[in-house]
């Protein structure tokens, strides 16, 4: 009986490893798109051991597109603003765990099952060129436009309309420069923050692995397939 249980556990772990390997080495999209456009735009993929964000360099056009975020305290027009940083995730874990010291059982449980989603937005200065956890990616102007549109479409809005106001989650932030907003979709362990980041990169014309639930796998796949 004990050996049977061990074999089942071992088989399950082997299957998970196989899925992670295949999810990384099999590209999405499977066939490379049109690469004729000049990749004169740079975006950043920011990562820590469990989460990824996408950072867009601030310019006048980006300020205009995301001017609505000012109502949530995001200082898009601040003269020192260099990047707008976007991250999608599960509401309980994302909003209640700013540091590992804040880790609690219920948010972890919800992140492993099913939870409503939120969008975290921060405005930052520049990032050092050699900063760990920062991957610089080059994309075309058309890819950049698609990416901005996809990020904007990830916000949940009043009346469910694309032109409606974004929904600020009042009283929740990590510091003075960031805010949380209601987002579209549901978060779970299989389709989490890193699969959202992968989907955004795909919109930008960056190929990723087919399924990359971990930051390290997403970074590896972006290097492998581009």
Model-based region annotation:
Residues 2-28, 32, 153-226:
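Activation targets extended, charge/polar-rich intrinsically disordered C-terminal tails
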Residues 31-32, 37-182:
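Non-catalytic ligand/cofactor/substrate-binding and regulatory segments of enzyme domains
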